[in-house]
């Protein structure tokens, strides 16, 4: 069971590539939602309003199933796809790479564009800090007050993060634990009910 994934830190990775007087500025961001992607891309379009193209690609989610590549007026699959290819090759997720192109007056051709966008993305990724994050699952358990010591012994033993707890005649605890250990935690807590 996969219970971790690779992403980048919150520090923006910046890259640069130049080819036949065209300049490619690349920026890699840690993102978690499509709304965040839209906001960042809109910000770059506004900041670099005089640039010819603002191409990007992103991948979201621990399963890496939500992704998109945008060519922003470049010939089909010459900008967004090479950027996405670098994200895929690096096995990263929760990432957005934006590449701004300033046209230098000389056409690069499709292969030249593919190389330029790919190299700009590679440079941005080279200036990022890669981090591994755990996939966690929430476990909620309701119990009676006399069971408190047994529940807390399991919590101490398995070391989940305590998100919320209520202690009264009827108690409740909400825990966050690594996905691969969640079933074991549920099973151990459930066994307390039968003792």
Stretches with model-predicted labels:
Residues 1-78, 164, 182:
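C-terminal regulatory domains involved in ligand/effector binding and gene-expression control
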Residues 175, 181-184:
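Terminal, non-globular segments
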Residues 27-30, 137-143, 170-177:
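Short cationic amphipathic helices and targeting signals
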Residues 151-157, 184-193:
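Short amphipathic alpha-helices in soluble, non-transmembrane regions
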Residues 96-99, 106-150, 154-155:
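Glycine- and Gly-Pro-enriched alpha-helical subdomains that act as flexible
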Residues 54-56, 130-139, 165-169:
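Interdomain boundary/hinge elements
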Residues 48-51, 158-163, 190-195:
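A common structural junction motif
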Residues 67, 74-108:
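Ordered, amphipathic secondary-structure segments that act as subunit-interaction surfaces
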């Amino acid at each position: 069971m996969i219970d971790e994934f690779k992403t980048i830190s919150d520090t923006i990775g910046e890259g640069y590539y130049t080819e036949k007087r065209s300049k490619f500025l690349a920026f890699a961001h840690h993102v978690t939602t499509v709304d965040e992607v839209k906001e960042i891309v809109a910000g770059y379009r506004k900041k670099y309003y005089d640039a010819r193209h603002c191409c990007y690609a992103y991948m979201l989610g621990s399963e890496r199933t939500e992704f998109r590549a945008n060519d922003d007026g470049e010939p089909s699959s010459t900008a967004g796809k090479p950027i996405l290819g670098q994200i895929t090759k690096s096995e990263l997720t929760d990432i957005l790479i934006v590449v701004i192109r300033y046209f230098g007056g000389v056409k690069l051709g499709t292969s030249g564009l593919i190389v330029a966008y790919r190299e700009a993305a590679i440079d941005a990724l080279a200036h990022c800090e890669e981090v591994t994050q755990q996939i966690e699952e929430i476990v909620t358990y309701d119990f009676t007050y006399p069971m408190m010591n047994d529940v807390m012994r399991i919590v101490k033993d398995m070391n989940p993060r305590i998100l919320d707890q209520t202690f009264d005649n009827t108690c409740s605890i909400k825990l966050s634990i690594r996905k691969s250990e969640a079933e074991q935690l549920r099973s151990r807590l459930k066994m307390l009910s039968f003792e």
